[in-house]
Amino acid sequence: MSKKRRQRGSRTHGGGSHKNRRGAGHRGGRGNAGRDKHEFHNHEPLGKSGFKRPQKTRRDVETVNLRELDEDIAVLVEDGIAEESDDGYVVDARDVVEDGYEADVVKVLGAGTVYNELEIVADAFSESAEQALEVADGEAVLSERGEELEAEKDSTDEEDEES
């Protein structure tokens, strides 16, 4: 049965109240009326925008400060995370950081003062961390992963210089 046939005998033919089909007031205006005021929410832009970094360039970096390592060294030795040696203490930063083994890179930052001789093994060090360790007669040792990252960085630097 057609809509026209179904609406026979109906006073308003599906328009609700008899007032609703008069003018354009029931619709809030005709066409694009009100698009900057009362119908503004209907005109938000859709779709993608912006820039997404390629997944291969993204790295999950976990950080730890020298201050934390130096202050907590006694607890770390007690828990078996750090080892005491003749020259001082040996710490693997991956063991200290909560998600160290899940992270792509574990980086040591240079905040704080170092009072103990620390030999820290990590994937990356900030310049200030390396300097602070040198001043305290400590050592910054790159892990295997850190050496791979350095090699990658050097190869990309050479490619950039050629182009």
UniProtKB/Swiss-Prot annotation:
It holds the Pfam family Ribosomal_L27A. Residues 33-46, 142-154 have a biased composition (Basic and acidic residues). Residues 1-29 have a biased composition (Basic residues). Gene3D superfamilies: 3.100.10.10, 4.10.990.10. Coiled coil: none annotated. SUPFAM superfamilies: Ribosomal proteins L15p and L18e (SSF52080). InterPro entries: Rbsml_uL15_N (IPR027386), Ribosomal_uL15 (IPR030878), Ribosomal_uL15/eL18 (IPR021131), Ribosomal_uL15/eL18_sf (IPR036227). One of its GO terms (cellular component) is cytosolic large ribosomal subunit. GO terms for biological process: translation. It comes from the Archaea. GO terms for molecular function: rRNA binding; structural constituent of ribosome. The keyword Nuclease does not apply. Residues 1-59, 135-163 are annotated as: Disordered. Keywords: Ribonucleoprotein, Ribosomal protein, RNA-binding, rRNA-binding. The keyword Metal-binding does not apply. Belongs to the universal ribosomal protein uL15 family. Binds to the 23S rRNA. Part of the 50S ribosomal subunit. This is Large ribosomal subunit protein uL15. The lineage of its organism: Archaea, Methanobacteriati, Methanobacteriota, Stenosarchaea group, Halobacteria.
